[in-house]
Amino acid sequence: MDQTACAGNVVRPSGKADGHACPEADRKWVLVAAILASAVAFIDGSVVAVAIPAIRAGLGADFGQAQWIMNGYVLLLAALILPGGALGDRLGQRDVFAVGILAFTATSVWCGLAQSPEGLIAARLAKGAAGALMVPGSLALIARNYPKAERGRAIGLWSAAAGLTTAAGPLVGGAVLAAGGEAAWRWVFLLNVPVGIATLGLVMLRVPRDPGREGQGIDWQGGAVAAAALGLVAYALTRWSQGQGDAVAVAAGLAGLALLGGFVLYERQRDDPMMPPELFASRVFSGANLLTLLLYLGLGGILFYLPTTLIEARGLSEALVGAVFVPMTLIMASMARPVGGFVDRHGPRWPLTIGPVVAAAAFLALALTAPSGGFWTAILPAMALLGLGMGLSAPPLSTAVMGAAPDERAGAASGVNNAVSRVSQLLAVAGLGVLAGLAYRAAIPADVSGLDGVGFGERGEGLSEAAEAARRAAIGAGFRALGLAAAGLALLAALVGWLTQEGAPTREGADAPDPANARSA
């Protein structure tokens, strides 16, 4: 029986085509809550990149511990986000979402009060687990409470906010670090607390409660296998990002891939699987996730390594480096609503083709200008171009993913896309980081000494003037190689968008087709 979630936390039957859409007056609160929760999650995922030097100084963390502080959050988020999304489908999106917000807020306090590198790593791991309950629920709630004819615009605002807050993380971090003293890095985490409390109150008071999928059990075995598989893959990539491409990393990666294969086979045998295999029969769904992997792999590398390049190769301040993301942020914000409306009327194919091409041009421009180009005349315009590309890409990407899945699978669909996004971030740090490191080493002149133990983005102690100049130039060469690779990935994403996405909505105002009936890949 179709259900409609309504104000006052009541669920009433409905015969509408958009069975779960709540009254128009209540939808804005769903969207506000989803955006706020996503904001703290995505800021937390990117802000630490700028704060890492201050954290290392404050806690005495070595380089390996700093990598775990950065990647531990993403590792657990990637491992648990698919089960977290499916859990919302089973138990009710609002309740699981609220638990995730509460846990995320509590672990933010833990991070801010950590007294050792090990304590902060543990807190970041716990925060990743909390985020796995919160992040997929934000998008699933929008899909559940908005009719399909209006979802493109709503998801456009949500996805733009996600991109904006990811990009705004370094800006926020730079401002906090510039304004505070040695312990200012703690406020990078503690700023989440009041936002988390306010969001939790909004969810409990104004977001409609949904009943979940009644009469069906939870696929705990499938969830455990998925978590183990994604966790092993994420762990392997994390070791690679630390320069530890050893037998342990290889074994973990192979074991994770084997478990992913076993997970697919296991889910095919279940009558009510956590991750319905038929979702991937949709060309739109599978293509959107492949596009996510390619585009966000390039974007993740740029966003993670650009601050390092500007600080270490150019000697720019943290506050100025944070400001480099402002053009991207403003342009994405201005494009969210019109692009979402365009997708509602005309489908996602054109934005998901043109957007990645524009992003590729921006990546190429950054590759050529970030190491030595003018900050105001080259780097900021390139970031504005990147904002245009991502502003065209982000809203239709999320709309395509959620439109290809039935409402009762919204959490699982969101979980899959978020898992792909997190894995792409880990691949960016690990894979593109290895590429940048190789280019960095190759760019160091043979007659320069003192840089044997100084890796890409690291500072050397007591370097000669020649060695310091060589280090800075080599960092620029490393980022240039990374940017060229990111541009190539974005062009591949554009090709995927053209080949897999619909050029027009199936039927204006109508439900999207079930995956089983969608055109197969």
Task: Label each PLM-derived region with a short phrase.
Residues W29-V50, V248-A252, L259, D272-A442, ...:
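12-transmembrane solute porter fold
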Residues D2-V30, L265, G460-A521:
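Transmembrane-helix exit segments and adjacent C-terminal regions of multi-pass membrane proteins
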Residues N71-G85, V135-L139, V326-P338:
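Central cavity-lining transmembrane alpha-helices of secondary-active solute carriers
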Residues G60, G92, L113-G119, G181, ...:
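Helix-breaking motifs and short loop linkers at transmembrane-helix boundaries and internal kinks
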Residues A178-T292, G298, L316, A474:
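Hydrophobic transmembrane-helix bundles of small-molecule transporters
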Residues D89-L91, D95-Q221:
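Helix-loop-helix hairpins in multi-pass membrane proteins, especially solute transporters
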Residues A51-A79, G119, A319-A323:
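Extracellular/periplasmic helix-loop-helix junction of adjacent transmembrane segments
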Residues A54, G85-A86, R90, A175, ...:
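Membrane-interface helix termini in secondary transporters
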